[in-house]
From Swiss-Prot:
Keywords: Apoptosis, Metal-binding, Nucleus, Zinc. Residues 19-116 form the Yippee domain. Its main location: nucleus. Zn(2+) binds at C23, C26, C79, C82. This is Protein yippee-like 3. Belongs to the yippee family. It is found in: Nucleus, Nucleolus. It comes from Danio rerio. It comes from the Eukaryota.
Length: 119
């Protein structure tokens, strides 16, 4: 008989000397401030930030959505620790002016907090 166990998820920890953003629900690290591209985005629940890279985030399947800036293929992203949906990842932009978003991540402000080194 084989005993089934839940796979252990290992969290990434960002350097404590940098300003960072964490999940508001469980405090898992999400991104360094240095990876912030823009604060001028709109999520489904309000303001959102665009990041170049994130950690401790899982990705759902991509789907086409008509967003404020046109049609994009996006995948919902979620905190790997508490499984809260945080925003989405831009998989593909169909308009040339939006190509810079490909591979980037949107995290809604309602799901993250500033952590460490903010004065």
């Amino acid at each position: 008989m084989v005993k089934q166990t839940k796979a252990k998820t290992f969290q990434a920890y960002l350097d404590s000397c940098h300003r960072r953003y964490s999940c508001v629900h469980c405090r898992a690290h999400l991104a360094n401030h240095d990876d912030l591209i823009s604060k001028s985005f709109q999520g489904s629940q309000g303001r959102a930030y665009l990041f170049n890279s994130v950690v401790n985030v899982g990705c759902g399947p991509a789907e086409e959505r008509l967003l404020l800036t046109g049609l994009h293929a996006v995948a919902d992203i979620y905190c790997e620790n508490c499984h809260t949906t945080l925003g989405w990842k831009y998989e593909q932009a169909f308009e040339l002016s939006q190509k810079y978003k490909e591979g980037k991540f949107i995290i809604e402000l309602s799901h993250m907090i500033k952590d460490n080194g903010w004065d």
